[in-house]
Amino acid sequence: MRILISNDDGVTAPGIAALHAALADYAECVVIAPDQDKSGASSSLTLDRPLHPHTLGNGFISINGTPTDCVHLGLNGLLEHDPDMVVSGINLGANLGDDVLYSGTVAAALEGRFLQRPAIAFSLVSRQVENLATAAYFARKLVQAQGLLDLPPRTVLNVNIPNLPLDHIRGIQLTRLGHRARAAAPMKVVDPRGKAGYWIAAAGDAEDGGPGTDFHAVMQGYVSVTPLQLDRTFNDAFRSLDGWLEGLR
């Protein structure tokens, strides 16, 4: 078993080191990750300049690009042997609900699945490393589960681990994505020369976070496992849209 590990926090982030350590004695692991923090990169590819791999002293490979770039290169000839699976994380910070639209952590897994490998993304619901060992434990547990290799086509798993010690975790729940309220307005800043700039503000709170959602699971102390699909077609809208378009044809 060969596993390609990536993330969006960057190749030197503590989460990817913890993930590699958790899986290194289970499989042959190769780390390919961005050379800097690329949180929020989503599934973007770098098309305006060449990408340069650089092998660090610990054997990890850094790329001057996005998480999707890293997985794309890793599964398209950069490595001598093709990986069998893609594992992304461990992200420091939640990827719940609508976060998946922006997450580079989730995007790395999606790229792996697009390139026909089983893929899973892990996030610790905290910006701190205190309970990173809890996330690493569940990452190993879920990666080793045989069912990951039998996922439906074009499906990945998005896993969020509560910020709790291992013995406080209540179990694992299969969940759907919740939804966040609208984010706060961007924060305006003015530099010493009077030029305005803007910081993207924090994500909104959970608006749809009731039982069955990923938000609810982690709030109750459960690891949340949410299946995501590459196909974003909203099939239930076909009937109403067909009637609307009929008058335009």
From Swiss-Prot:
EC number(s)? 3.1.3.5
Q: Which family does it belong to?
A: Belongs to the SurE nucleotidase family.
| Gene name of the encoded protein | surE
What are the annotated GO cellular component locations? cytoplasm
A Pfam family this protein belongs to? SurE
- Subcellular location(s) per record: Cytoplasm
What does the record say about how the cofactor binds? Binds 1 divalent metal cation per subunit.
Job of this protein: Nucleotidase that shows phosphatase activity on nucleoside 5'-monophosphates.
Catalysis: reaction(s): a ribonucleoside 5'-phosphate + H2O = a ribonucleoside + phosphate
Keywords associated with the record:
Cytoplasm, Hydrolase, Metal-binding, Nucleotide-binding
Output the PANTHER family linked to this UniProt entry.
Answer: 5'-NUCLEOTIDASE SURE (PTHR30457), 5'_3'-NUCLEOTIDASE SURE (PTHR30457:SF12)
Q: Which domain of life is it from?
A: Bacteria
Binding positions (a divalent metal cation): D8, D9, S39, N91
Q: Which protein are we looking at?
A: 5'-nucleotidase SurE
Q: Which GO terms describe its molecular function?
A: 3'-nucleotidase activity; 5'-nucleotidase activity; exopolyphosphatase activity; metal ion binding; nucleotide binding
The cofactor(s) it depends on are: a divalent metal cation
Looking up Gene3D superfamilies in the UniProt record yields: Survival protein SurE-like phosphatase/nucleotidase
Task: Give the EC class as a word.
Answer: hydrolase
What InterPro entries would the database entry show?
SurE (IPR030048), SurE-like_Pase/nucleotidase (IPR002828), SurE-like_sf (IPR036523)
